[in-house]
Amino acid sequence: MINNIRQDAEVRMEKCLETFKNNISKLRTGRANPNLLDNIKVDYYGSIMPLRQLANIIVEDTRTLVITLFDQSIIKRVEKAIIISDLGLTPDLSGTIIRVQLPSLTEERRRNLIKIVRNEAEQGKISVRNIRRDANDHIKILLKNKAISIDEERRSQSEIQKITEAWIRRLDQILSEKERELIDF
């Protein structure tokens, strides 16, 4: 029973970490990354489709993305979708491909992005702590139902605490890497 509670907590904490990584990977750091365009949707013959499903997006250099559309007839719609997105990107049509140059980040924008990343990290930590609380509550229920002893309860809660601290350290490590990336570019 206790192993199931611990494993469930670890799986849920790992999902929190993956969500955090996914959220911060979409932030523009000055370095080209195809994930920047994940939220761009394009009108494709009456259906709203993600750009990623309509094109191949590759990194040409550190500050340029190249978009090669599967259907060239929608090139203007894709250009418009990129322009109206709130990413501050300007597409450049070059025949059958679209190049997107990433402008360099201003100091103010860097500080703003660091605040956003720190906030995302804090939300991740809160989620991890909530998972710890849920696991501890389940352990207390087992104690109340006399399924485990007081010693087992304390040992289990100590284990859960160590697991929580490990996942929070991982979150902090990813946070510091992202902050360094934002400062360096």
UniProtKB/Swiss-Prot annotation:
CDD domains: RRF. Gene3D superfamilies: 3.30.1360.40, Ribosome-recycling factor (1.10.132.20). Keywords: Cytoplasm, Protein biosynthesis. It is found in: Cytoplasm. InterPro entries: Ribosome_recyc_fac (IPR002661), Ribosome_recyc_fac_dom (IPR023584), RRF_sf (IPR036191). GO terms for biological process: cytoplasmic translational termination. One of its GO terms (molecular function) is ribosomal large subunit binding. Responsible for the release of ribosomes from messenger RNA at the termination of protein biosynthesis. May increase the efficiency of translation by recycling ribosomes from one round of translation to another. Belongs to the RRF family. This is Ribosome-recycling factor.
